[in-house]
């Protein structure tokens, strides 16, 4: 399994080499623990950095590294992505962002999960309509949101543009990694919002 992005440097903070990090992991204490060696990737270059301090600041982290001693060195990290191997938790039934990106999006209409399953897998009419592909996942206080590039030939007013779909069980009842697709049961009007 490929390494995952666990955070990204936004900007320097202060004059002593601290950086603002936008975390993209549910395991912040483990990933950014003091003494943890992080792999920073930036414009094709990689370097190892050792965490010497981490504190929360609003929805982000302020992190210091042994190798970064001042603001100029911290500025050189702007935009760097921290990559790490996945942590495996057998009790976790969630999905990593990279597993969702690239999945085809099948619309079965505004129906319940059982009807969605019958339409997607048992041939019940009307069959699902392939509307596009997941191109990104964003995370906010209300949960994850899928960024979907709607196919230019889709029969939707948003054809050729990007729409946002809340990644909630009521709207995305089926994620089928084996068939590289997910099924959506959007409320009326959701797919028309660009």
From Swiss-Prot:
Keyword Cytoplasm: yes
This protein's record includes keyword rRNA processing: yes
GO cellular component, one term: ribosome
Family statement: Belongs to the RimM family.
InterPro entries named in the record: PRC_barrel-like_sf, PRC_RimM, RimM, RimM_N, RimM_N_sf, Transl_B-barrel_sf
Protein name as catalogued: Ribosome maturation factor RimM
Keywords, alphabetical: Chaperone, Cytoplasm, Ribosome biogenesis, rRNA processing
Segments crossing the lipid bilayer: none
Organism: Corynebacterium urealyticum (strain ATCC 43042 / DSM 7109)
Domain of life of the native organism: Bacteria
Function recorded in the entry: An accessory protein needed during the final step in the assembly of 30S ribosomal subunit, possibly for assembly of the head region. Essential for efficient processing of 16S rRNA. May be needed both before and after RbfA during the maturation of 16S rRNA. It has affinity for free ribosomal 30S subunits but not for 70S ribosomes.
Subunit structure: Binds ribosomal protein uS19.
Domain commentary: The PRC barrel domain binds ribosomal protein uS19.
SUPFAM superfamilies: PRC-barrel domain (SSF50346), Translation proteins (SSF50447)
Compartments where located: Cytoplasm
Single GO molecular function: ribosome binding
Domain PRC barrel: 92-190
GO BP annotation list: ribosomal small subunit biogenesis; rRNA processing
């Amino acid at each position: 399994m490929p390494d995952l992005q666990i955070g990204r440097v936004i900007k320097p903070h202060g004059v002593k080499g601290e950086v603002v990090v936008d975390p993209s992991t549910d395991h912040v204490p483990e990933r950014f623990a003091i003494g943890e060696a992080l792999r920073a990737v930036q414009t094709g270059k990689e370097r190892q950095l050792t965490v010497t301090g981490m504190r929360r600041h609003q929805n982000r982290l302020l992190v210091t590294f042994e190798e970064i001693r001042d603001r100029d060195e911290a500025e050189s990290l702007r935009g760097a992505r921290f990559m790490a191997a996945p942590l495996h938790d057998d009790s976790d039934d969630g999905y990593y962002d990279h597993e969702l990106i690239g999945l085809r999006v099948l619309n079965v209409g505004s129906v319940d999960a059982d009807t969605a399953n019958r339409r997607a897998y048992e041939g019940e009419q009307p069959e699902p309509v392939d509307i596009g592909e997941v191109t990104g996942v964003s995370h906010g206080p209300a949960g994850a949101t899928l960024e979907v590039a709607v196919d230019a030939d889709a029969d939707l007013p948003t054809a050729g543009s990007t729409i946002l779909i809340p990644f909630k069980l009521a709207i995305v009842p089926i994620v089928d990694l084996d068939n590289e697709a997910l099924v959506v049961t959007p409320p009326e009007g959701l797919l028309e919002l660009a």
